[in-house]
C-alpha cells in the first residue's frame, strides 16, 4: 500500500513540470494577457486565436530584430469606439508577420459600420485597423486573411525595405446597407493599403475586396504594386496629394494587376488649392472590368466632400506613363477623365491602351483636348 502511494505521488510529481512548461510557454500566446511577455522575450511568436479586449492594442511595435509572428485560429477585437485608436500596430527590422493555414483576423467592422466611414463625428471608430510604422530591414508581411475592418485597413508609414504579399483583405460583408447606413453600403472609406512617407515598399499578389481605394499612395518613393486583384473599391490610386505633412510622390509602379467592379481603374488625384509633387508614376498592364465612373482618372480638383470642377495647379504632376491599360467600363462611365490645372501637368506618355464601353464622352484637357484612344 505504502509503496503504491509513493509510486503514484512520484509519477504525479514528475509529470507536473512537463505539463506546466507547456502551459507556460511564453512564445505561444493563447490569451491577450500573454502578448507583452511574448513580444519582449521571444523571436518566434505564435498568436493562437484570442480576443483583444476593449481599449487594448495588439501591440507588435517592439518586436526584436529578426522576429517572426504567426497568427493561428481566429483573432477578434472587442469594440473600441475611438477615431484615434489603432487595433494593431507593427514595427521592427527584418521581421516576418504571417498566418497559418485557416487563420482569420476579424476587425469587428459590423459594430462600427454606418455608411459614413471616417466622416462621422457622432459614431467614432478606429480610423486605421493596422498601422505599420518604421518597419525596415527587408521585413515581410505575408499570407494574412483579414476581414471586416472598420474604416481603412493598412496604414504603412515611415517604412522602408518592406514587402507585403499573399494577403486577402475581404470587406464584402460591408457592401450591403445596414440599420445605420440607410440605403448606402454599410462600410465606407475602407482603403486596403494606404502608403505614406515610405521608401522601397512592395505590394505583390494581394487580393482586396472593399469599398474605397485598393491602394492609395499619398507620399513616398520607390513603391512597386504588382499582381494585385482589386474588387469593389476605387481602384489603384495616387493621392490624394497636397495639404499633408509630406506631399511628395516619386517613383511608383502599378504593374500587372486587375481592377474589377470598381468605381475607378487608375486614378491620380491632387487636393484643390494645395501644393506638392507627383513624379515618375507608371501604370502598366492593368486590366479593367466593369468600372463604374472612370477607367483612367487624373484630377486636380479633389476634395473629400467631392470634386470642385475647378482644377488648381499647386501640385505638379510629371512623367506619368499609361502603358497597356485595357478593359471595359460601364455604359454610364467615361473611359478617360483628365482635368489638370494650368501648366501643372507635363510629360504624360500613352501607349497600347484600349479602354472601351463608356457611354459618356471622355473628357481631357491634357496633353490636348482630345483624350487618348
Curated annotation (Swiss-Prot):
What SMART domains does the database record attribute to this sequence? PbH1
Residues at the catalytic site: 212 (proton donor), 234
Q: Which residues are glycosylated?
A: 65, 94, 280, 290
**The gene coding this protein:** PGA
Q: Which GO terms describe its molecular function?
A: polygalacturonase activity
SUPFAM superfamilies per UniProt? Pectin lyase-like
Query: Which organism does this record belong to?
Result: Fusarium fujikuroi
Q: What is this protein called?
A: Polygalacturonase
Which UniProt keyword terms apply here?
Answer: Cell wall biogenesis/degradation, Disulfide bond, Glycoprotein, Glycosidase, Hydrolase, Repeat, Secreted, Signal, Zymogen
Amino acid at each position: 500500500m505504502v509503496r503504491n502511494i509513493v509510486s503514484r505521488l512520484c509519477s504525479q510529481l514528475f509529470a507536473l513540470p512537463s505539463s506546466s512548461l507547456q502551459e507556460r510557454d511564453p512564445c505561444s500566446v493563447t490569451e491577450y494577457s500573454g502578448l507583452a511577455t511574448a513580444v519582449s522575450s521571444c523571436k518566434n511568436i505564435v498568436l493562437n486565436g484570442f480576443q483583444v479586449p476593449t481599449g487594448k492594442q495588439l501591440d507588435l511595435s517592439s518586436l526584436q530584430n529578426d522576429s517572426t509572428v504567426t497568427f493561428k485560429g481566429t483573432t477578434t477585437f472587442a469594440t473600441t469606439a475611438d477615431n484615434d485608436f489603432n487595433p494593431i500596430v507593427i514595427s521592427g527590422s527584418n521581421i516576418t508577420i504571417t498566418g497559418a493555414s485557416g487563420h482569420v483576423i476579424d476587425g469587428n467592422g459590423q459594430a462600427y459600420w454606418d455608411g459614413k466611414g471616417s466622416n462621422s463625428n457622432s459614431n467614432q471608430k478606429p480610423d486605421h485597423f493596422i498601422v505599420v510604422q518604421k518597419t525596415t530591414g527587408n521585413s515581410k508581411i505575408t499570407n494574412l486573411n483579414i476581414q471586416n475592418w472598420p474604416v481603412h485597413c493598412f496604414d504603412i508609414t515611415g517604412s522602408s525595405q518592406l514587402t507585403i504579399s499573399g494577403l486577402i483583405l475581404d470587406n464584402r460583408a460591408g457592401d450591403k446597407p445596414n440599420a445605420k447606413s440607410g440605403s448606402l453600403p454599410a462600410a465606407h472609406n475602407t482603403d486596403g493599403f494606404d502608403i505614406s512617407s515610405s521608401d522601397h515598399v512592395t505590394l505583390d499578389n494581394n487580393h482586396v475586396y472593399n469599398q474605397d481605394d485598393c491602394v492609395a499612395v499619398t507620399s513616398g518613393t520607390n513603391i512597386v504594386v504588382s499582381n494585385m486583384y482589386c474588387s469593389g473599391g476605387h481602384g489603384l490610386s495616387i493621392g490624394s496629394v497636397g495639404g499633408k505633412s509630406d506631399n511628395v510622390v516619386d517613383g511608383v509602379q502599378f504593374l500587372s494587376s486587375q481592377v474589377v467592379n470598381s468605381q475607378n481603374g487608375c486614378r491620380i488625384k491632387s487636393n484643390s488649392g494645395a501644393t506638392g509633387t507627383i513624379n515618375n508614376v507608371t501604370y502598366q498592364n492593368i486590366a479593367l472590368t466593369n468600372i463604374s465612373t472612370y477607367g483612367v482618372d487624373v484630377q486636380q480638383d479633389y476634395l473629400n466632400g467631392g470634386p470642385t470642377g475647378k482644377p488648381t495647379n499647386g501640385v505638379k504632376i510629371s512623367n506619368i506613363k499609361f502603358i497597356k491599360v485595357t478593359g471595359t467600363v460601364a455604359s454610364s462611365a467615361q473611359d478617360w477623365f483628365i482635368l489638370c490645372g494650368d501648366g501643372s501637368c507635363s510629360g504624360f506618355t500613352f501607349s497600347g491602351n484600349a479602354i472601351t464601353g463608356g457611354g459618356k464622352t471622355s473628357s481631357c484637357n491634357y496633353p490636348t483636348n482630345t483624350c487618348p484612344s
